[in-house]
Amino acid sequence: MLWFKNLMVYRLSREISLRAEEMEKQLASMAFTPCGSQDMAKMGWVPPMGSHSDALTHVANGQIVICARKEEKILPSPVIKQALEAKIAKLEAEQARKLKKTEKDSLKDEVLHSLLPRAFSRFSQTMMWIDTVNGLIMVDCASAKKAEDTLALLRKSLGSLPVVPLSMENPIELTLTEWVRSGSTAQGFQLLDEAELKSLLEDGGVIRAKKQDLTSEEITNHIEAGKVVTKLALDWQQRIQFVMCDDGSLKRLKFCDELRDQNEDIDREDFAQRFDADFILMTGELAALIQNLIEGLGGEAQR
């Protein structure tokens, strides 16, 4: 659960107080509570260590991890449509007239309210890591929307959260394209066998290469024809593999077995100690990877 699978990276745009003791109280005000009978969705904080601790924050070496849970009620459109049509047909038969659009819209709200208490719930959890040493916030999710929702919850909890997506001085896609074109990456990184190339033209095509030599003539021809690399699978120090995206996010993080097994000497029964050790190990590696990546991509954009 702890090992992050994706990274959406944000930079704190100014210094703010992020002390765990203070945060614990602030997050408690927005702790997760389940949906009521008429709620479509609810989001709040839960302990990152699950049932093993009541604490809403876990801290080590200036790194803080927190966890947001979201509950969403599932009401399939066909179910709503069927119930609404039945209600409309019944009323039209009783009143011997066609209902107006405003009346139908009002009925739809009634139908939704009647169905909500019986709807199934879908739960999801999103981990967030706050690096107070380097002034970064990382969200473990694959979509910017989900990351923004989690950041919005934190902003509401803290009262203020001045963050911007981490951005580079040079467009990331141009740097990735040059790495593939030349076959030479920044120090510490190696090309793997997967990439996505897009045409710069609005209605241009997209090429997805998998299990392919990215230095081959076929890929070079696409680049010479005007396509740029928007996603690129990379290996870092033979420790972490990931897909670098042109929006600055890292997808499909895969930690090498040697790295993941580093804390195997800790008894798995001692969940808290193992969680803490894995958290220190993971954040240490990822912080080094992010720093290496910033340098390799030509440096962070000036703010």
UniProtKB/Swiss-Prot annotation:
Gene Ontology CC terms: bacterial nucleoid; cytoplasm
InterPro entries given in the database record: RdgC
Classification via Pfam families: RdgC
Coiled coil: none
Annotated GO MF terms: double-stranded DNA binding
GO terms of biological process kind: DNA recombination; regulation of DNA recombination
Keywords: Cytoplasm, DNA recombination
Highest taxon above the source species: Bacteria
Subcellular location: Cytoplasm, Nucleoid
Record family assignment: Belongs to the RdgC family.
PANTHER family registered for this protein in UniProt: RECOMBINATION-ASSOCIATED PROTEIN RDGC (PTHR38103:SF1)
Function: May be involved in recombination.
Protein's name according to its UniProt entry: Recombination-associated protein RdgC
Natural source organism: Escherichia coli O6:H1 (strain CFT073 / ATCC 700928 / UPEC)
Gene that produces this protein: rdgC
